[in-house]
Amino acid sequence: MTVSKYNGVASTFNGVARRFDFAPLEADKLNWYPRSALPPEIPAIDLNKVNTEEELAQFLVDIRKSGLFYIVDHGIPEEISIGCYNAFREFCNLPEEAREKYNTDESFKSGGYVPFKGTSIGGGNLFERQKDFVVKFFWRGPSVVNRSPNDRFAEFHDEHHRKTAELAEKIITTILKALKTRFPEFHPDELKDNINVRNMFFSNRIYPEAPPDDGEKADYRLVPHRDLSFITLANQVPANNGFKGLFILTGDGEKIPVPPIRNSYLVFIGQGLSYLTNKYLPAALHGVDFPDNTNFEGSERASLISFYEPNDYMMPSKNINPLPEEIFEKSCTFYDDVGVGRAGTTYNYVRYKFHEGYYL
């Protein structure tokens, strides 16, 4: 157990030491799903085809279906994401004592390792807390010196950060243009300060084939939650047995599995963007399921999760005024719970409140 501090708040990493033997990933041998397997709530969007006012208006309709959508044909070489996955898998195969050297709750600032079951999302799963059944490595990007086990690890992670930051900026710019089709008084420059590569970090994640221990109360690999971010980008690779672990929950409580589509990026609208648009855009409620007891073998999955944080100074747009029936009331519940209103706040305050209750 490691006890350290983040912004003066004591945090405990009570992770579980585990031995791993992860084989390298080969993209051509993975059980990808076709785009036709996507449910209607999760559209696949090519941003190169979103240009005209009509296309922007349809894009806005599509991203409001669930707050989650795929970006395809984005131009990021698949070798970058696969290289990231394999560098982390190689790291995880080291003894826990060697990995532990990179374990620190400063990971959100300058990278670092989080052991299996080392975190728990405060406020997720209706405040029923459980540990996350995942091992992670956070990466802040080339603007800082990250903790890294070797140069190859750093090169792949820096390049993934650069490419996904460029894609995120294109996505954000398109979203802001699309908002103007519904709210003519809104101007994209109003929220342009949220486009800042220094606001992004990502985590490399593996969900091992690990069921709960006997007597352990755990309903999910990762409990249902909404990200605090402006937007979140996610690349995911499939489980060998075809199990679809990632899911979203719709407004009526329906659970919809999210199939992994080859070399594509999921976009989750975050609570930050929902807050700044006065809950017009819905933050996606999502989590990761366990397989059933007969389906654990081959259920390991992995993902690269890039959090694009909002600008520190946060003021909801005065020119985005949705009708009552257009508002997603529960879309930024963490912001509501910590007492953030239309008068604005700083993201540092929101983040501090989050970290205060994040780690078990």
Swiss-Prot record:
Per UniProt, Fe cation binds at H225, D227, H286
The metabolic or biological pathway listed in the UniProt record of this protein is:
Secondary metabolite biosynthesis
Catalysed reaction(s)? Answer: prekainate + 2-oxoglutarate + O2 = kainate + succinate + CO2 + H2O; prekainate + 2-oxoglutarate + O2 + H(+) = kainate lactone + succinate + CO2 + H2O
What molecular functions are annotated in GO for this chain?
dioxygenase activity; metal ion binding
Q: How is the cofactor bound?
A: Binds 1 Fe(2+) ion per subunit.
Tell me how this protein is used.
Escherichia coli cells expressing Digenea simplex kabC are successfully converting supplied synthetic prekainic acid into kainic acid, thus providing a less expensive method to produce this molecule for neuro-pharmacological applications.
Q: Which domain of life is it from?
A: Eukaryota
Q: How is its activity regulated?
A: Inhibited by the iron chelator EDTA.
Which UniProt keywords are listed? Dioxygenase, Iron, Metal-binding, Oxidoreductase
According to its UniProt record, the EC number is: 1.14.11.-
Q: Where is the Fe2OG dioxygenase domain?
A: 200-310
Residues that bind 2-oxoglutarate: R301
Q: Which cofactor does it need?
A: Fe(2+)
Q: Which Gene3D superfamilies match?
A: B-lactam Antibiotic, Isopenicillin N Synthase, Chain
In UniProt terms, what function does this protein have?
Answer: Iron/ascorbate-dependent oxidoreductase: part of the gene cluster that mediates the biosynthesis of kainic acid (KA) and derivatives, natural products with neurochemical activity acting as ionotropic glutamate receptor (iGluR) agonists, thus being neurotoxins. Catalyzes the conversion of prekainic acid to kainic acid and kainic acid lactone.
Q: PANTHER family given for it? A: 2-OXOGLUTARATE (2OG) AND FE(II)-DEPENDENT OXYGENASE SUPERFAMILY PROTEIN-RELATED
Q: Which family does it belong to?
A: Belongs to the iron/ascorbate-dependent oxidoreductase family.
Give the protein name, as stated in the record: Alpha-ketoglutarate dependent kainoid synthase
